[in-house]
């Protein structure tokens, strides 16, 4: 299977049968050739130099990321980056490795259930139900068992290894509805 075929399959999978105009999407191939055959695919939230190196060393031909590769939502800021040393080093690393990078952002957020939020809920082992809203709306999740922000904060720290999580408002008010 080549990169373009894989991209088309993932686009179709996220469609949920609902029409949507993706003509302005950031879900594009940032580096590489869409005709490249794919045998290994790496997936990460970010295309950091460490992730790029690890994907290349693992033998991946394609790295799928959720966030921008070159610091702007559409990754169309090359002229303004110009001779920026960080940009140049990352661009050179991608050229050296030959790794293709595809940003897969808008389609996953458009799916019910939003794929990113669904992953967060699953990883945090939250028990509840999704509340369907309009496309592109804030994702809402109803907890079956009330939880305080303090309890949720502790779970985020433990499950995700996050430190210095900030919360505003009452820390001990039991909640059942989350916006993600």
Spans of model-derived segments:
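Hydrophobic structural segments
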Residues: 1-180
